[in-house]
Structure formats: structure tokens, C-alpha cells
Amino acid sequence: MEEDLFQLRQLPVVKFRRTGESARSEDDAASGEHDVQIEGVRVGLEAVELDDGAAVPKEFANPTDDTFMVEDAVEAIGFGRFQWKLSVLTGLAWMADAMEMMILSILAPQLHCEWRLPSWQVALLTSVVFIGMMSSSTLWGNISDQYGRKTGLKISVFWTLYYGILSAFAPVYSWILVLRGLVGFGIGGVPQSVTLYAEFLPMKARAKCILLIEVFWAIGTVFEVLLAVFVMPSLGWRWLLLLSAAPLLVFAVLCFWLPESARYDVLSGNQEKAIATLKRIATENGAPMPLGKLIISRQEDRGKMRDLFTPHFRWTTLLLWFIWFSNAFSYYGLVLLTTELFQAGDVCSISSRKKAVEAKCSLACEYLSKEDYMDLLWTTLSEFPGVLVTLWVIDRLGRKKTMALCFVIFSLCSLLLFICIGRNVLTLLLFIARAFISGGFQAAYVYTPEVYPTATRALGLGTCSGMARVGALITPFIAQVMLESSVYLTLAVYSGCCLLAALASCFLPIETKGRALQESSHREWGQEMVGRGTNSTGVPRSNSGSQE
């Protein structure tokens, strides 16, 4: 009774009385307002009219009806065998994405020497991949919201696999430039695997599972470096490109096992398909389905850009765009800076080293040595502790504070590089900086799918991913071009950018820790319900949201 009383106090709607007797007078009926007496407590209620055909939200339904939403089913079924399979399959997509990114740092110097390419053509080979990713990220998000998460992910994977294999047979520079750009276009859809994955996860496991999926990114980068160590000296870069497509090939074969998101099916009106998917998951996990009838969410337009800029989401969208931009800008900038700093020994040696090589021919080149591959491997390994730290703090501090913490520590490490330090301390600072900037990236991947409703979740993640590619596209001009003029200005740019990103994280209006995924963008249906759990005092939480 205490729980019913709390809901009646919080929700401005009429609930049926269990006695079945009417407590309204004729004046009440005319005004649409009346009081209800429950065990001596009078509660003022207000009648709300529903549009014809509109689904009645569970919170407002007759308490004698047994109904449930997709969120209830996912929570009841829990984490089990199905989610483990999905974790591995989603991880393969992330592993393939990481390998395609890591191969850029291996392929560029190889083609520079083999085809005698000038420096600007080598740089363009990297930039064209990010241009493809930047231009397609929003498109893949729109496709996933309009036609389904599985559809968008499958098309992007087959696209990337096809052009990735063709890249290995490119006869001349112009061909590989076009083909790698098309590979980048396909990679722009890989982040949609996180959207699909998150929508099948119970609330308590969501953050940990998404972060653990990011481990596959680190595994992919390590695997690519190890593959290059054995393949490049004997078989060459063409075989490296072919073998690097292996995770995508495995994913393409197994992706037919993937179900469509039940949340998407409900939102698009496919109730029977959603129920079938939920029953399949319950069977695989050996868990019972909730009793009753699945409530269909109000059908609405999906994948519309304007929905990201409604008054409720406008500020969140703009701040997230800057956060994602800063993440990629700093992450890939650090990757480029690492090679420069290792070759120079420390920051103070860079300027003199640059002057010494200015007179060298632009076509001069050096093949990557085994020592170079080991340096790449060492810096890549720093992402594993980054995952562990983020995993430990994200459910303790919350998503916003975790992102802010990662940005602040990266900024401090960048500032400490101003000091003329030895190689060992330099390596330690670079290790810590990369661990935390990768941790900030991972926290953003947790937060973004949680903050947007199902109707715009894929588009929101896609546009954020697109802004990240803008940062990745710009950062070579800072980490390589500006570095030649002033190493201190370069470090100041990265440090300042991350400090601003930390502030942006703090100013995000919604904290998604302990919050259920939103099904609808309509606030009147309680879009910011904080799960169906309780707060620290054991009192059920209202639908006022988690805004701070």
C-alpha cells in the first residue's frame, strides 16, 4: 500500500480503486479533478486523456492487468548464455575495427618505401580512411534507427569485408587510396554493434559488459602488430591486408545468428517478433519470461536528426559531440606523438632532431624494424589497465565523473611532458596518458547509448562517432605539423582540449548511472524513469529523471 501511495503522489493520473467504487462527484467529473481517499490520506489527482489508439504506459495501466515492457523482460531474464555469445560476436566486430585502424600505422611506411611515395601521399592514405568514417557514421546510425540495428550492422560489415579484401589487390596508389576510403566508409557502421549489444543487457551488467567489449579493441591492436611481425618480412603487406579481414569474415558468417533488437521491434510495432526474440533469449538463458502482455511503445518517427536537438536533448548532444571529438583528437594524437617522442628521446630533443632532418629528401624512408613493432606493441598494451580502471570507477563515480577524471589525468600527463625527462619517465607518462584517454573513450561508449531513447539511439551514437572521426582527421596536423614548429604549443593544445572536455562532461545534464534505457522520446510517458529499482533509502524512485 505504501508503494501505491507513492506512485499516486508522483503521477498526475487517475488509478482504478481496488474496491471498484466511484469516489467522484458530478462536479469532479465536470472539472476532471478529484481526490482519492486511501487509508485516511487524501491525494489530489488529475485526469489525463489519451489519444485514440495510444498505448497506455505500464505506470498508468489498471493494476489488475499483468503487463510488462521490454526493459522488464530484459531485467527478468538477466545475463546468461545468450549475452555471452553476443559479447563474443560483438567483440569480433570491435576487433576487426581496431585491426583496420592499427594497420594504418603499419601500411603507410611500407608503401612509402615500396612505391616511393612523397610524405603528403602517405598522410593522405591515413586521412582518407577517417574521411570515409566521418562521412558515413551518421548514415549508418540513420539506417540502424530506420531499418533495424541488425540490418545496419550487417550491411556495414559486408561492405568493409568486401573492400578490405579488394585493397589487398590494389595495383597502384590511386586504387588503394579509393579502396581504403571505402573501407573507412564501412567501418563507420561498426559502432552500431554497441547499440545492438546494449539493448540486450540488464541494467546492472550494462556498463561492465560494454567496457569488457572494449577489451576486444585492445586485443585487435595487439593481434595486428603481432601479425605484422610474422607476415610483413616474408609475405608482405598484401597478405597482411587479407589476413586482417579474418575477424570480419568470421563475424559475417555468424551474424545470421544475431536477432534484431526487441526494443527496436516494439518501437516499430512488431510485437510478435519482439516476443519471439525475448522467448528465445529466455530459453537460451534458462530463465522464465515475465507473465502478462508485452506493452507496445508509442510508434514514432525514428532516426530523425531533429530529435537530437529537441529542448531536452540539445545540450546533451552538443556536449557529447565535443567530448567525442576530444577523445579521438587526443587518443590518435597521442598515438602519433608517441613515435615522435620515442625517436627523439624526450621533448627537449625534438626541435634539434627536426632541424637535423629538414634537409633530407622527402622520399627518404625506413622500413619498420622489429624494435619499432615492439614499441607499437608496448604502447598498445596500456589500454588494458585503462579498461580495468574505468571498469572499477564507472559504477562508483558515475559516467560523467569517470569521463571527467580520465580527461583531467590525460591533461596532467601532457603538462608533465613539458619537463625534460628521461626515456623511462617519458614511457611511464605516455603509458598512463593512453590508458586514461582510452578509458574516457570507453566511458563515452557506455554513456551515449544510455542517454538517448530507442528511437534515436543509433543515430545519436552515429553522429558522436562521426564527430570523433573529425577529431581523428584534424589531429595529424597538430601532432605532426605543429610539432615541427613548437612541441610545447602542441602539448598545450592537447592538454587544453582535454580540460575543456572534462568541463563538458561535468555539465552533461543527465547522469545515466542506474538508469534504464529509454524506450520513447516522449517525456509524458516517463522517458527518464530510473530503472524500476529503488534508491539508496529503499524508496521507489519517481520518473523525474537523473538530471543534475
Curated annotation (Swiss-Prot):
InterPro entries: MFS, MFS_dom, MFS_sugar_transport-like, MFS_trans_sf, Orgcat_transp/SVOP, SVOP-like_MFS_dom
Sites of Phosphoserine modification: S25, S31, S542
Membrane protein topology class: Multi-pass membrane protein
SUPFAM superfamilies: MFS general substrate transporter
Stretches the record annotates as Disordered: 523-548
Ranges per topology, Cytoplasmic: 1-87, 144-156, 202-209, 260-316, 395-401, 446-457, 511-548
Main location: membrane
Superkingdom of the organism of origin: Eukaryota
Stretches in topological domain Vesicular: 109-122, 178-180, 231-238, 338-373, 423-424, 479-489
GO molecular function, one term: transmembrane transporter activity
Localization annotation: Cytoplasmic vesicle, Secretory vesicle, Synaptic vesicle membrane
Any GO CC annotation of this UniProt entry: synaptic vesicle membrane
UniProt-listed Pfam families: MFS_1, Sugar_tr
Comp. bias intervals (Polar residues): 533-548
Tissue expression pattern: Detected in brain (at protein level). Detected in brain, in synaptic layers of the cerebellum, hippocampus and cerebral cortex.
Record-annotated membrane-spanning stretches: 88-108, 123-143, 157-177, 181-201, 210-230, 239-259, 317-337, 374-394, 402-422, 425-445, 458-478, 490-510
Keywords noted in UniProt: Cytoplasmic vesicle, Membrane, Phosphoprotein, Synapse, Transmembrane, Transmembrane helix, Transport
Family: Belongs to the major facilitator superfamily.
UniProt protein name: Synaptic vesicle 2-related protein
Underlying gene: Svop
